[in-house]
């Protein structure tokens, strides 16, 4: 009667493709194709099966809410893995990457990878709900170009601060 989910957040390069670690590397398959094991006691017919469906970590919270019978918020972007197991193509593509690094989109077979910054893709902005970073605040100089931006689907209708990025 226990749902068991085992996953990782990303891989780690140990010299593959000439890269070490993970901070500024392109998001190669070794980093993003990570293990996910799910045992759902409601689905004994799926025990021991392997699925090639395109899923992401955004599907984990909806999976837990679904298992416990809780309602999914209307703005939640992930989908319960119980639905994914029955769908042939639960999603057409997945977007992944990180601010300051490569941004990618995949259909599960091919990946389009784009570097974050060059002279042709300006302007670049940071979006935040509060003007702080992990280790400190934005400087007054960085905040001079701040504007309010339209909300994203995941900000629950709250506008974000749009701050010009300084790569």
Predicted regions and their residues:
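Activation segment
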Residues: 14-15, 85, 114
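C-terminal, low-complexity/hydrophilic appendages and adjacent surface loops
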Residues: 28-29, 99-167
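Histidine-centered active-site microenvironments of extracellular/periplasmic hydrolases
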Residues: 2-47, 56, 91-92
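Short loop segments at secondary-structure junctions
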Residues: 40-44, 69-71, 108-110, 116-117
């Amino acid at each position: 009667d226990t749902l068991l989910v085992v996953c990782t957040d990303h891989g780690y390069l140990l010299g593959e493709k000439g890269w070490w670690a993970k901070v500024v590397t392109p998001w190669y398959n070794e980093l993003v194709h990570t293990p996910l094991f799910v045992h759902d006691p409601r689905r004994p017919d799926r025990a021991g099966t392997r699925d090639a469906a395109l899923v992401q970590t955004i599907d984990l919270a909806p999976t837990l809410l679904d298992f416990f019978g809780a309602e999914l918020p209307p703005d939640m972007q992930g989908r319960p893995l119980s639905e994914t197991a029955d769908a042939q193509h639960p999603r057409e593509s997945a977007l992944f990457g990180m601010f300051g690094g490569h941004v990618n989109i995949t259909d599960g077979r091919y990946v389009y990878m784009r570097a974050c910054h060059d002279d042709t893709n300006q302007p670049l902005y940071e979006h935040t709900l509060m003007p702080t970073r992990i280790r400190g605040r934005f400087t007054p100089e960085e905040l001079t170009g701040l504007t309010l931006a339209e909300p994203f689907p995941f900000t629950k209708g709250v506008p974000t601060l749009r701050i010009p990025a300084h790569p």
